[in-house]
Amino acid sequence: MIEDLTIVIQGRYEEEQMKLWIENYSDWNVVVSTWIDCDLNLDFPKNWKIIKSEYPKRFADMQNIDLQISSTLNGLSEVNTKYSIKVRGDEFFSNLHLVYEKMLQIHPKVLVSSIFFRPLGLYLYHISDHFICSTTDNLKIMFQTTYDLLTKGDKFNNSPESHLGFSFICAKENWNLYDVYQYADVNDNMIKKWYDIFEVNQLQPYIISESSPEGRIYYRDNYGYGSHHIYEL
């Protein structure tokens, strides 16, 4: 385990992935933040914290970003370590010590996965949200500021990752949260200033989940990259 790091597993979890988390990280600091109706009767380690919350009143029609924000903030509220890594309950990653080590090297930048990290300029402030690692305070800032944006203003596109990426920078740079286009011309510089990418294929074996018109797609090795994906800045 890493004493000053907590894994926050958020959202609905799937049995295969959660069993892998239990098998590989039973002695780590872990918070599982899920929903009241998610119950697979698994034997969770006694040192883990399990939070089952009521669903929030929906506040954003955008790929369940409101559920991600709520479950993540619920989980972060139970964290007592300096650093956290937010992951999804329908995914699994091995070797998270590598993420932690790189995060320390690039701090105060936030370290995110390479999954769906869009090329600079393709979409404003589009990071990846499949895992996010930084100080616990930084993660709280990111998700709380995104909550403020979506409950008090309007979404500026249909990408949850853009709102998370922009909101954190807004908080750090003291920008106007409700006018992303005012900062469009500094997108590339600010992404490089505040974020870095971890190439996910270093974390095999893994399970990565993606939605598609035909249903969920799962990747278990050699996650590829196309014209809409990058793995380094």
Specify the residue positions occupied by each region the protein language model found:
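Active-site acidic Asp-centered loop
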Residues: 35, 87-89
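Short, polar loop motifs at secondary-structure junctions
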Residues: 13-14, 33-40, 115-120
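Acidic donor-binding/catalytic loop of UDP-sugar-dependent glycosyltransferases
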Residues: 69, 89-103
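Short, well-formed alpha-helical segments that are part of the catalytic scaffolds
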Residues: 13-26
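N-proximal low-complexity "stem/linker" segments adjacent to membrane-targeting elements
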Residues: 1-16
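Active-site-proximal specificity loops/subdomain of glycosyltransferases
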Residues: 33-78
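Catalytic core and acceptor-binding pocket of nucleotide-sugar-dependent glycosyltransferases
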Residues: 93-98, 110-233
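Short aromatic/hydrophobic "clamp" motif used to bind/position activated sugar donors
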Residues: 84
